[in-house]
Amino acid sequence: MSLSEEQVQHFLDQNPDFTDQYFGKTLSPEHVAGACGDGQPTDCASFRELCQVEESAALFELVQDMQESVNMERVVFKILRRLCTILRADRCSLFMYRQRNGVAELATRLFSVQPGSALEDCLVPPDSEIVFPLDIGVVGHVAQTKKMVNVQDVTECPHFSPFADELTGYETRNILATPIMNGKDVVAVIMALNKLDGPCFTSEDEDVFLKYLNFGTLNLKIYHLSYLHNCETRRGQVLLWSANKVFEELTDIERQFHKAFYTVRAYLNCDRYSVGLLDMTKEKEFFDVWPVLMGEAQPYSGPRTPDGREIVFYKVIDYILHGKEDIKVIPSPPADHWALASGLPTYVAESGFICNIMNTAADEMFTFQEGPLDDSGWVIKNVLSMPIVNKKEEIVGVATFYNRKDGKPFDEQDEVLMESLTQFLGWSVLNTDTYDKMNKLENRKDIAQDMVLYHVRCDKDEIQLILPTRERLGKEPADCEEDELGILLKEVLPGPSKFDIYEFHFSDLECTELELVKCGIQMYYELGVVRKFQIPQEVLVRFLFSVSKGYRRITYHNWRHGFNVAQTMFTLLTTGKLKSYYTDLEAFAMVTAGLCHDIDHRGTNNLYQMKSQNPLAKLHGSSILERHHLEFGKFLLSEETLNIYQNLNRRQHEHVIHLMDIAIIATDLALYFKKRTMFQKIVDESKNYEDRKSWVEYLSLETTRKEIVMAMMMTACDLSAITKPWEVQSKVALLVAAEFWEQGDLERTVLDQQPIPMMDRNKAAELPKLQVGFIDFVCTFVYKEFSRFHEEILPMFDRLQNNRKEWKALADEYEAKLKALEEEKQQQEDRTTAKKAGTEICNGGPAPKSSTCCIL
């Protein structure tokens, strides 16, 4: 039985529930698409309303996207693309809310999203953002009012701005926009443009818009809260670590900044930052004021800090994080230095404002360098600059941060984080005065060292006195081959026999200082170390000449004494046969230590340095002068043109420096008494070996024992003047005494103290007695034990004993004269007393009593 069309229509009208159920089931989009026959699914938006199943499927897909994707832009992009389809809008856009410099703004993040768009085409890169202040455009109005806006005709809307249309060439007719809120705070604004199938967006569109944006709001809230959490975490870490490093270094501002910045660099989220330190001087020097007062110069009219100081950056510290990390310190930077040339740091120092510039290329107030700053191709894109303020509210510097790592401009959270860091830096800069003083002292020290090196170093003319290459070869030593220099030196040097450098009785009294330099060079050739260790011969000559100039022209501790000690060391090693225990490298170091052991001696001892509060005493706690001599020697060796160790490998170099440390410090007589017993045990131990060869093999491998022997050798060398022939020793002793008396004069006049007898000029006649005491108390043990250790050294001990006899004879002679003078004085006193008694008798006084007779 068939029903007519009217009957079916009547049935459906009478049964609305059945009608809804039937059409909801049979007229789904899939059935309609299948009925179309072309195989293309029908767009859901072709229906005015979605069925509940399809709507649920769409919402489930959105939730699934949110769950699977952590990228906010990707999820919101899918939502906007679906909204375009459902609302039949031409396109949708996402504007992110942010604050810079305390001013709120909206910036495009997803722009012109259409149903067929790709994410890469719609995602706006940071350098292409369109930024709307809140007082411009419908999007700004929505952010201000925090309410949805449906503009049916933009020509009738007072808030509409054609700014974006003019940039893109697009024509906007109607707008549907709503804010995304996190509590009372605006996070973003989403906007749909131009209804395609109608004159404007309807109230039904608004409902659908809000329904789908609930998911977008959730996603944006998660993103916003995650960002805030990340910012607070970074801020907490910056506060923690910067505080830790700031209070770890309280004197050196560069180390403070380096430690603080280096430690927190990962939390600052920028490519580069620089800190400009301001000059805190408030009063000018007189020579700067005079031209102004005389009318010859205009008074300063440039910018000033809020407290009236002229803005002068005395130092810029530039910290580089992109590419290879580096830190650069620029003292007294020029005005055209890239960190200052834009004028932004000066403006911040003048105003005290925080400046956040999102696009430096388009900024009209400041002129930043447009091209790359260095070879890496790094270019300034956005900048955040803020003042560093101390507790007195004085601006002491400006911190400027460049290029946020993700390419976006710095926002309010970045400002808060950077400001937290600069607050700590502001407190740390309270120590700039201390740092400045330390820096100046360091600079003065460098200048002083350079001056010393200039006056001590052998110059081009002086080297010709020993290496006459101009006269013989017609060129400078640097242009000569080593063989040529070797032949020339062989002709110039005196040889080993002319001045008896192998003998213990060597005397420098007949030698000039230049001849002693030549003898010093000769000793290195005799040891065979010049060729073995590839010492450049020009360097060797310069070193010996410079060492001789490094000794001051004082009475005893001068270059002659320095050479005598080195010559005695050379003689102990060779003639005394002690070289059998040491390698060539060690002998090389020991002779060099002898040459340098008293360099730059001041003619006063360690005790005087402490009494006079000499800076050396503050620098070195013990063995004051010895450590200074060591440092001076190392200072000369650090100069490339004087470094005779330059061709040693690392291990060899460390070894010779170690031996020099021990040898030179060992010349402190205060340490001599500590090592006497140890040396005596080594000498006694040597007597237990019947075979000399076995003993040599044993001691050669005993590093500690060798060092003790070497230390005692240095003492023997330092005191060797006491073992010279009497005619030499007597003259040298007077030189030593004269230097002691000079120190005694200083103690009496400068320190207002009474010197000890040895240094008292008024007791010069007691010198022989003092010499005998010195020989008995200090010298005898050294040379007696060395003569037991090696019989080849016996001549030194014999001459010591002979010199003692001479001094003893003089001392006895002096004692006899002194005794005779005392007896004569006593007799004179007796005669005076007797004469006085006789005068009293003549004047009627009582007669003296007699033991043999009585006067009646």
Curated annotation (Swiss-Prot):
It is linked to Irish setter dogs affected with rod/cone dysplasia (RCD1) contain a nonsense mutation in the gene that gives rise to a protein of 807 AA lacking 49 AA in the C-terminal. Its EC number is 3.1.4.35. A lipid is attached at residue 853 (S-geranylgeranyl cysteine). Residues 823-833 have a biased composition (Basic and acidic residues). One of its GO terms (molecular function) is 3',5'-cyclic-GMP phosphodiesterase activity. Coiled coil: none annotated. It is found in: Membrane; Cell projection, Cilium, Photoreceptor outer segment. Binds 2 divalent metal cations per subunit. Site 1 may preferentially bind zinc ions, while site 2 has a preference for magnesium and/or manganese ions. The modification N-acetylserine is found at residue 2. This is Rod cGMP-specific 3',5'-cyclic phosphodiesterase subunit beta. A divalent metal cation 2 binds at residue 598. Keywords: Acetylation, Cell projection, cGMP, Disease variant, Hydrolase, Lipoprotein, Membrane, Metal-binding, Prenylation, Repeat, Sensory transduction, Vision. Disulfide bonds: none annotated. The gene is PDE6B. It comes from the Eukaryota. It is a lipid-anchor. Its cofactor is a divalent metal cation. Residues 71-220, 252-429 form the GAF domain. The active site is at residue 557. Belongs to the cyclic nucleotide phosphodiesterase family.
